[in-house]
Regions:
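Basic, glycine/lysine-rich polyanion-binding surfaces/domains
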Residues: 1-138
């Protein structure tokens, strides 16, 4: 769960494909001034991991994401490669991990920008299976 503002929370499911976490939350009773706003159809969710992830972001994001400046579970609503984005640091065990959420219409553009930035650090896409392995280690 990430606090975006005083009255707004963002709840991300875990990376387990069989998780029913979000469905359980959707079925819970909520207060009169509370409502859910599903973002699965409007947002993409990317993850950048690794010891040089924060340095890589310095090429495409104005927020200082280095570990001593941007704590685990911190959130920033900012722009990444000129696309509006939410960046959440959510380490997987001892591996630095940054979740990037942006409008689905910017997904391909942002993906290309992140891949380009990763190349300088010998990084590249790894897929969800690798993310699950990192989460299991933590």
């Amino acid at each position: 769960m990430v606090r975006l503002s005083y009255h707004e929370l963002l709840i991300l499911s875990n990376i387990d494909p069989l998780s029913t976490q979000i469905e359980r939350l959707d079925s819970m009773a909520v207060g009169p001034q509370t409502y859910t706003l599903p973002r699965a159809d409007s947002h993409c969710w990317l993850a950048v991991t690794g010891s040089q992830a924060a340095e890589m972001f310095s090429k495409v994001c104005g927020v200082d994401l280095r570990p001593h400046k941007f704590a685990n579970n911190a959130v920033a609503q900012t722009s990444v490669a000129k696309a509006s984005a939410i960046v959440v640091r959510h380490d997987l065990g001892t591996t630095h991990c940054f979740y990037v959420l942006t409008d689905v219409s910017a997904a391909e553009f942002l993906w290309d920008c992140l891949i380009d930035a990763m190349l300088e650090y010998d990084g590249g896409p790894v897929g969800v299976a690798s993310m699950r392995e990192l989460a299991a280690e933590g």
